[in-house]
């Protein structure tokens, strides 16, 4: 496998350390740790994690495992973070940060009871630690709320938010001078909406709820796997994660044209979270979906879920810009988003990837019940969370959910289901895209300079109905207002 930029940086750092003097392996590991700490501070998490790994091989300590766990958390590799936190605690049961790291990883995976157990351990050891007490109290609230929600979920007479909305009762203030949605969505309305968002102004709550309710009712009618036909000679565009980077979304349209009946798009999940313009992003997409329902497609990602939205900013942003009721409405709506798309019966598009088990067919996918929060295993979980790996076979996911699947898995699945290749997203790539598995799997990621720190390009894929060979267009990030990523995220648990 070709060396990456990360590999080159790590090699350079290690060469410089070899040129220095050190008394023993313990001191050498400490020097590598110091270098890794600096890369972590500079938010270069790939290099930091690799350097911590080298130091661990030389002289493993609880601190090294704890530090690498933190780097993995930043990379959203929650499974690896859990494993490192366990190792840190095994080496030193009094290492409090090990419990913190494990709790944070479990929080990200929605395993709140396990997280609460670790926060209890920290509070017991550090009873006067205000931060530990705050985390314990907040996690306790979440566990209590989950118990309450589980209890009322058995109430079949409970109405959805959509059923309780009274949009007509929402008054429009005389001072409101933004877009007005009187009847059906029009192209003029959507373009005015984008202009309003670019000027950092809001759509009125009444119109926002009206759009969201219409979108909710529409996506409920869709199948779990949507089938798309691209006619001969016609272009079709596939985009990956956008993650609330509204101004980069607008740049895609500047480069590739606005969505229309002659310029259709598919956005492959993770519309929201992390980027602090997720509200603007999702309402722009909803606008185009309602305007061009048969030419603008949206697939669910792992971040279109309740747990992720609570941790990574979307819930906080919606509450700040609108209301808790709208958060709840989005939660209900996201559960009805399709899980995947099939283009011309040959291109399979999903957010994450393929499956832990052999034998999954397109018909199995069609029959999958998607109206729920993502489970920890099964077809729906794998579609949202899995990643390709370069070696044959399958491996446990470093994310802690889903699996890693090799080229043999992809080849067999494509042959079984008559698929030419798989398009998925879910992972940052330096050029915005990457080919895997001998051209039978492609990653596309459309959030350039992800979180204002990764320096990656974004990309999108174009095909035509008579030429399904993917063509990639990389693009750079564009400026945005001075609101940092994760501005609305749950800072209490380290998710910002």
From Swiss-Prot:
Record note on what altering residue 375 to E does: In av101; no obvious defects. Restores exocytosis of cortical granules, chromosome segregation, cytokinesis and polar body extrusion in a sep-1 (ax110) mutant background
Repeat listed as a keyword: yes
Catalysis performed (reactions): O-phospho-L-seryl-[protein] + H2O = L-seryl-[protein] + phosphate; O-phospho-L-threonyl-[protein] + H2O = L-threonyl-[protein] + phosphate
Region described as Catalytic: 184-496
SMART domains xref list: PP2Ac (SM00156), TPR (SM00028)
Cellular localization per UniProt: Cytoplasm; Cytoplasm, Cytoskeleton, Spindle
Active site: 303 (proton donor/acceptor)
A GO CC term attached to the entry: protein folding chaperone complex
Main subcellular location: cytoplasm
Keywords from the UniProt entry: Cytoplasm, Cytoskeleton, Hydrolase, Magnesium, Manganese, Metal-binding, Protein phosphatase, Repeat, TPR repeat
Record note on disruption phenotype: RNAi-mediated knockdown causes no visible phenotype.
Cofactor binding, per record: Binds 2 Mg(2+) or Mn(2+) cations per subunit.
Family the UniProt entry places it in: Belongs to the PPP phosphatase family. PP-5 (PP-T) subfamily.
PANTHER family the record matches: SERINE/THREONINE-PROTEIN PHOSPHATASE 5-RELATED, SERINE_THREONINE-PROTEIN PHOSPHATASE 5
Biological role stated in the UniProt entry: Serine/threonine-protein phosphatase. Dephosphorylates cdc-37. Probably by dephosphorylating separase sep-1, may be involved in sep-1-mediated exocytosis of cortical granules during meiotic anaphase and mitotic cytokinesis.
Record's protein name: Serine/threonine-protein phosphatase 5
The gene coding this protein: pph-5
């Amino acid at each position: 496998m070709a060396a990456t930029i990360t590999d080159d940086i790590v090699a350079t750092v290690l060469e410089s350390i070899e040129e220095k003097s050190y008394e023993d392996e313990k001191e050498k590991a400490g020097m590598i740790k110091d270098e890794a700490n600096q890369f972590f501070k500079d938010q270069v998490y790939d290099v930091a994690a690799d350097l911590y790994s080298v130091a661990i091989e030389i002289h493993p300590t609880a601190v090294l495992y704890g530090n690498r766990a933190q780097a993995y958390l930043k990379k959203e590799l929650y499974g690896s973070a859990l494993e490192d936190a366990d190792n840190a605690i095994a080496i030193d049961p009094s290492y409090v940060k090990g419990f913190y790291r494990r709790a944070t990883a479990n929080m990200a995976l929605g395993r709140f009871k396990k997280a609460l157990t670790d926060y209890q351990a920290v509070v017991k050891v550090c009873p006067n630690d205000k931060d530990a007490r705050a985390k314990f109290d907040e996690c306790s609230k979440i566990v209590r709320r989950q118990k309450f929600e589980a209890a009322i979920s058995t109430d079949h007479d409970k109405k959805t938010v959509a059923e309780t909305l009274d949009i007509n009762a929402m008054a429009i203030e005389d001072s409101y001078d933004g877009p007005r949605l009187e009847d059906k969505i029009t192209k003029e309305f959507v373009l005015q909406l984008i202009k309003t968002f670019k000027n950092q102004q809001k759509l009125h709550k009444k119109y926002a709820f009206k759009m969201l309710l219409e979108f909710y009712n529409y996506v409920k009618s869709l199948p779990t796997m949507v089938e798309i036909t691209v006619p001969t000679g016609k272009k079709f565009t596939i985009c990956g994660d956008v993650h609330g980077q509204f101004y980069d979304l607008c740049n895609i349209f500047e480069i590739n044209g606005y969505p229309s009946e002659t310029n259709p798009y598919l956005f492959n999940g993770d519309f929201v979270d992390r980027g602090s313009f997720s509200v603007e992003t999702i309402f722009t997409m909803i606008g185009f979906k309602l305007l061009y329902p048969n030419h603008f497609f949206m697939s669910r990602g792992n971040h279109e879920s309740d747990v992720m939205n609570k941790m990574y900013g979307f819930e906080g942003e919606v509450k700040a810009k609108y209301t808790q009721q709208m958060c709840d409405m989005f939660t209900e709506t996201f559960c009805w988003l399709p899980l995947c798309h099939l283009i011309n019966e040959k291109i399979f598009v999903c957010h994450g990837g393929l499956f832990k088990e052999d034998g999954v067919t397109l018909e199995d996918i069609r029959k999958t019940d998607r109206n729920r929060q993502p489970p920890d295993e099964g077809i729906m979980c794998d579609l949202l969370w899995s990643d390709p790996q370069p070696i044959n076979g399958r491996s446990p996911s470093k994310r802690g959910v889903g699996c890693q699947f090799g080229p043999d898995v992809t080849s067999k699945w494509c042959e079984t289901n008559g698929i030419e290749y798989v398009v998925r997203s879910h992972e940052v790539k330096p050029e915005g895209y990457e080919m895997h598995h001998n051209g039978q799997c492609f990653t596309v990621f459309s959030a350039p300079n992800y979180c204002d720190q990764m320096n990656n390009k974004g990309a999108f894929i174009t095909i035509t109905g008579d030429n399904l060979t993917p063509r990639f267009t990389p693009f750079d990030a564009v400026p945005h207002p001075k609101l940092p990523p994760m501005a609305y995220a749950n800072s209490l648990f380290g998710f910002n």
